[in-house]
Amino acid sequence: NEVNWYDAIVYCNKRSKAENLTPCYSIDGSTDPDTWGTVPTSSNSTWDAATCDFEANGYRLPTEAEWEWLARGGQNYTYAGSDTIDRVAWYTENTNTTGTREVKTKAPNGYGLYDMSGNVYEWCWDWSDSISDSSAADGVASGNNRVLRGGSWFTFDGLYCQVANRNSDNPNLRFNWYGFRVVRLAN
């Protein structure tokens, strides 16, 4: 399956509604994905203007800062859970570019999270921009590309699977090496 950033926010709101949680994402003032229309396959200014209610109790994509904190797992390894890539990540060297692998087949990080390095790149909420100490925790207000983190099975160089590595792409692009992970507010 291929997934773009727009697909990810639809999933988050639909899952939130199915579990009687307050959806986080809004497009044109509506949190109901059934009113948003067809998921775009090209750049779409209406969908790009989606907002996120970070106080809602529903599912959402992590911000880039949250993603990195989760990937580090309370440790300071190069990859999520180890300094040895093959211990924790699926990438070109150990997949022969043959596709996504079953989750939880590599070691977890310090928080017990799997596949934060490799397997599929993970969409984050943020628009891509340079990061500084004064950067907002939820990223810049607009841009051309959304943040992707973690590397994938299609990553030719282990560098892209490093926790500190940043990548981005147009939110309408779908590839089978793109995916997402959801987060919720802690109780």
Enumerate the predicted regions with their spans.
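Surface-exposed recognition segments
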Residues: 75-76, 97-99, 116-187
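Short, well-ordered turn and helix-capping elements at secondary-structure junctions
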Residues: 92, 105-107, 165-168
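Short, surface-exposed glycine/acidic/tryptophan-bearing loops
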Residues: 85
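Short aromatic-cysteine micro-motif
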Residues: 1-75, 95-114, 186-187
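Short linear interaction motif-like sites in intrinsically disordered regions of transcription factors
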Residues: 6, 37, 48, 68, ...
